[in-house]
């Protein structure tokens, strides 16, 4: 009996020692950096495993990206993308109908404005990320900068993973939004949900914002994680299995370019246009051709063929 108990205890101890290896990985990304330095500095005072996403055209973008990097935090570009709903948009918001050159220009500008960025995630973007051809243009641009894409999943049928196929861009997906509600109790519920998903699936990504309520909850909870949960940077999950739940678009054709004459009113003719019949068309065409300079020239040449010049006639008669 005693040897059996010793074996059970030894097995339990082995499991306890191996638990860090089997720990669930939790990545937390805080979006919308660049507008509220006071709140954002509080986030930067937390463990460096928390990643931050900076809006590229925000007033403090470069400052906060540099601070985050110097504090050991991973920096992403929080790239504005067009939503389906009508709402105020950030400068340089990506839209599906933009050309590849325009999208590349915006991403290049964002990279310049947010130093030390290693990835990009979308700010809003339900319209953009659900458009396969628009996202293919995004992925082609990202590949040039060796950036990964964190899909914020603002719409169920996001095409990000499908669009990245054939490129070197790695895509990971958000699983939990921490603060759709800014009530602290609700944020705690979402934080615990992220922990449960990390435990169940091996890893998960939660996204929040530097709201005062979110900052307070993070300050309480990130220092009291369960022993089987490890806080990690978002990029450490790039090799974790990802499931593409999207469906291909029904009509897989690119968006038509914008018609520059759309909305322009055409003037109505004062008189009805007279019909042009075929016989009259050919008469006019024949007259036009016969009076052309080239035809007249050939006519003169043709009339002169076979006729000897006057000087030649005189010489011939003299001989």
From Swiss-Prot:
Domain of life: Bacteria
InterPro entries referenced in this protein's UniProt entry, alphabetically: Divergent_DAC, Glyco_hydro/deAcase_b/a-brl
SUPFAM superfamilies per record: Glycoside hydrolase/deacetylase
GO biological process entries: carbohydrate metabolic process
Keyword field contains Signal: yes
CDD domains linked to this entry: CE4_DAC2
Keywords, alphabetical: Signal
Signal peptide feature range: 1-23
Protein name: Uncharacterized protein YibQ
Organism: Escherichia coli (strain K12)
Source lineage: Bacteria, Pseudomonadati, Pseudomonadota, Gammaproteobacteria, Enterobacterales
Gene: yibQ
